[in-house]
Amino acid sequence: ARNKNLEADYYNYGNNSYNEIHLHNGEFLHNIGLRGQAMRIAILDGGFFNYKTLKAFDSVNAEGRVLDTWDFVNREASVVEDHPHGMQCFSTIAANIPGQFTGKAPKANFFLYRTEDTNGENAIEEHNWVCGAERADSMGANIISSSLGYTDFPQSPTLNHTYADMNGNNNISAIGADLAAKKGI
């Protein structure tokens, strides 16, 4: 049955992404033409190591669909020399290697923002995240994808969040995320 699905699908997902796509019936969306086109997705993470040279992003790069990048940690436009986690998250959305790996929205446009300093946990990263969300909003993002969360800051333990703090109203990143959601992001 699986091979019949692959033959009928718009994308040849290969063995590496079919189960992940199928988990949410994503191939149905791809088959009816919903592949992320006209969507603007901001990814806030710890870096996008070498995304410009990896085969998985050939389509995104060739079509100029990375619309903006910014490193809020080092305050520069380049995000390619830092940690790979953001690139890995980016691949689950944007990758397109026929027969090997296809992301969930391989035709979307992207904003890649490094807000996480992977050298340690510092409270400034929450502020970086909010700045990234604000920039995403100003650039017209429809979606923010971020796997970051903040509770403990070993370098500054007095800034740790208590359980009571994590009510969605007290820490800057929760307030920023709430404001983005109220704007429809």
Where are these regions (language model features)?
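Short, flexible loop segments at the rims of nucleotide/cofactor-binding pockets, characterized by
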Residues: N16-E20, E121-A123, Y163-M166
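Catalytic-core regions built around general acid/base machinery
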Residues: N167-G184
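Subtilisin-like serine protease catalytic core
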Residues: E27-E125, M139-N142, Q155, A181-G184
